[in-house]
């Protein structure tokens, strides 16, 4: 008797649940569980961009920048910027005649930053990069070891095409003015005067930002083209509506 009553109650509850589910529009049964908060969107975007850049080989590209070739090919003298620098200073520091290489080591992609434009319709992603630059000589090996940090700033725009498909596209992509930081990690003590360090960093100031920008920005564009469709749709909708992203500082 008790088993029959229990079965009747269970069947009644099942019928009510079925009726409620049928009343919901198809594809909208669990809208809250699928939606991401603005904070989640920011975390998902920066994490995806970071992983994408690593997958595209950004560290290998940084480690193989043709810096020495570009320095030798530039400038107003036949021997290029580096040759001009060495010629100017070799009379006081003979070791400079023996410089044979500029080697890049320890390239790193640091934690990405993100800010939203005041109108709420654009995002700016900061891509902090770092590396160590070794100026080598044939006589003593490493003459200078410089720590280099540089930020690339990427503008992300939300667009929808004629078919209504959402796209997150690359706007401006440039090195952040004043973000290049060069510091001396190691050197041969008194053999490395300040004017030498200033001269080398001055050359790097003119060459390195544009070189890194030219390599990294195409990678960002490639990563954007492979973003998860659901993530792109959510971000584009939020930007078009001017929804404020919650960004943790």
Swiss-Prot record:
Family of this protein: Belongs to the BPI/LBP/Plunc superfamily. Plunc family.
InterPro entries named among the record's database cross-references: Bactericidal_perm-incr_a/b_dom (IPR017943), BPI_fold-superfamily_member (IPR051902), Lipid-bd_serum_glycop_N (IPR017942)
Domain of life: Eukaryota
Renumbered residue ranges of the record's region Important for surfactant activity and antibacterial properties: 81-86
Coiled coil stretches, renumbered: none
Annotated tissue distribution: Expressed in lung and trachea.
Molecular function, one GO term: lipid binding
A GO cellular component entry from the record: extracellular space
Protein's name according to its UniProt entry: BPI fold-containing family A member 1
SUPFAM superfamilies assigned to the protein according to its UniProt record, in alphabetical order: Bactericidal permeability-increasing protein, BPI (SSF55394)
Residues bearing attached sugar chains per UniProt: 151
């Amino acid at each position: 008797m008790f088993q029959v009553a229990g079965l009747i109650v269970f069947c009644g509850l099942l019928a009510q649940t079925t009726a409620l589910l049928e009343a919901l529009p198809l594809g909208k049964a669990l809208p809250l569980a699928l939606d991401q908060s603005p904070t989640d969107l920011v975390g998902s975007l920066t994490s995806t961009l970071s992983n994408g850049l690593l997958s595209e080989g950004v560290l290998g590209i940084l480690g193989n920048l043709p810096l020495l070739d570009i320095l030798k090919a530039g400038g107003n003298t036949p021997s290029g910027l580096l040759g001009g620098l060495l010629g100017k200073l070799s009379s006081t520091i003979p070791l400079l005649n023996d410089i044979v290489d500029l080697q890049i080591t320890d390239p790193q992609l640091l934690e990405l930053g993100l800010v939203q434009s005041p109108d709420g319709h654009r995002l700016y992603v900061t891509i902090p990069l770092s590396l160590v630059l070794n100026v080598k000589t044939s006589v003593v090996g490493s003459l200078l070891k410089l720590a280099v940090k540089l930020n690339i700033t990427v503008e992300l725009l939300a667009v929808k095409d004629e078919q209504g498909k959402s796209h997150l596209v690359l706007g401006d992509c440039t090195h952040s003015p004043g973000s290049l930081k060069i510091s001396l990690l190691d050197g041969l003590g008194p053999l490395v005067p300040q004017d030498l360090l200033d001269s080398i960093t001055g050359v790097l100031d003119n060459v390195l930002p544009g070189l890194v920008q030219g390599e990294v920005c195409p990678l960002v564009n490639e990563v954007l083209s492979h973003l998860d469709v659901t993530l792109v749709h959510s971000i584009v909708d939020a930007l078009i509506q001017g929804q404020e992203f919650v960004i943790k500082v």
